[in-house]
Amino acid sequence: IGPAAQIGIALWLLLLLGVKGLAPILLENNSKDSRAFADDIKPMLPGHPNQVIFVEDMSRNGLNLYLQTNIKKVSFEPRPKPISDSAFDSSLAQELAQPADQRLFIMKREMEQAFLAGVQASGRTPRKLGEWIEKEKPSDRDRMIYTLDNEFATR
């Protein structure tokens, strides 16, 4: 490899390292930054969740890295699950029929009333842990965070 190629490779490596170093700064206020989301909600949690369940919402699968937990998505209505896969793992009613497992339920503000109705219909008691308000963003991006009675019972 000639001197020009060596300089080109060195510049390319510097560019790659620079982009890698700048990415966290550029993503700092990004709503899809799972690390920031996890850091924001950790103080609300009554313990370590075994499952984070997104109700009629986009899941943030990166939370499994920062909370060391399983991520699920549920819908209000049962939806057929094709062989290949489905956008939702189950319905809210199916999830609520499962035994307590230190679950968190996260949803957009506009889904909160439907979630509460579904939980109450199942005979369970919802417990609001808090709200995640995304900084400097419209309120339609706020997320409500719930658990259920006896989900985080002391062992």
Give a label for each model feature.
Residues 1-11:
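Membrane-interfacial entry segments at the cytosolic side of transmembrane helices
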Residues 12-118, 125-128, 132-139, 144-150:
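Short periplasmic/luminal acceptor-recognition loop of GT-C membrane glycosyltransferases, typified by
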Residues 152-155:
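Short, charged/polar, Gly/Pro-enriched secondary-structure boundary elements
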